[in-house]
Amino acid sequence: MVLCLRYQTDELNLYRMKRIAILGSTGSIGRSTLSIVESYPERFAVISMAAGGNLETALADAKLWKPKVISVAKAEDAGKLKAQLQSAGLDAIQVEYGPQGNVAVATHPDVDFVVSAIVGVAGLEATYEAVKAGKSVGLANKECLVAAGELITAEARRQNKPLLPIDSEHNAVHQCMRGGRIEEVERVWLTASGGPFLHTPKSQFASITVKQALNHPTWKMGKRITIDSATLMNKGFEVIEACRLFHMPPEKIKVIVHPQSTIHSLVEFVDGSILAQLSVTDMRLPILYALTWPERIASELRFPVQELKRLDFHPPDMEKFPCLRLAYEAAEAGGAKSIALNAADEVAVAAFLEGSIAFLDIPRVIEQTLRETKDHHPESISKVLSEDSQARHTAVEIVDHLAKTKVISPSAALTR
């Protein structure tokens, strides 16, 4: 079986301008994508954008990029944006809102490539509809593959269209596997920085503050993903993503702690050879790779090889970071368990950030939610979303119980 890295491509269309949609245009991935478009104006054109709740940035982007469609979160904001665009003489721009607005952005007939970067399951329906509409998709949204990876990858195979990972680790795996066959792969190694608590004794975890948990040693990211990195749940999600993207069982996806974050992933082959991908820690590089695949084009991003002094690796401590263990269990079960893992984590992290529960309660909420989730496989996106809603309800009840029965130390809340 050939890896899902080869697709029929139109040689004549390979080098023409790529017309893109950005789901999550005001977030960090969206801004990095627009930076690339700005650097390569002869290569890319922005056709549509989903801006979420950031009305000010949406207006500025609409004026600058002049997309055919722009979507915002709420109907009220859509009305305001439409009026502002009319005043600016840009009334030709179609303004949409809500989940269906995201779908309109992702499925616009002029779009070739969709960058899926809306955080959470809010981007799930639009991403699936983009795949269903025959678009090539660059995935920066972990939740899509964690919650509905089986459905999305199956549809991509039906459409014979690529799902190109933007997540740096999976992008690295994709590059290492390029041109290979799945039978040749012994295992995949996903590297983890270890987060801010790599060397913190487990005995001190009870007093971890939000401020400490948000202090990631390598990456500057959003709050949820930064907390997920602190618990290693982010790496657990990546295990599930890798299983779905590369059609491999969980036992072939390994996590290795690599504090320098120099190597993004490694692929070990059956003959004992190991390929590793090294690059600067700049998300523009994996985005550029996804946007230009199967080509590679020149960029100014360079890794200073001469400054490389050491590479450290050691196995993760599953007892210290139980979220990683829970993710492997969910990866093995798939279906509703994976959905519940993501939903419960989002609820638990939000509660921790608010100071309602302690850092150690995050895996407790997730594990209890998984216990209360029946093992089955939703067969449609609507059923996935329904399962997600139920899991969130369960997780909220568990959080409420913990908040009522435990006294959260002031040190566990963000210092105000």
What are these model-derived regions, one by one?
Residues 7-8, 15:
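Low-complexity, intrinsically disordered or signal/transmembrane-proximal segments
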Residues 14-416:
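Catalytic, metal-anchored helix/loop core of enzyme active sites in primary metabolism
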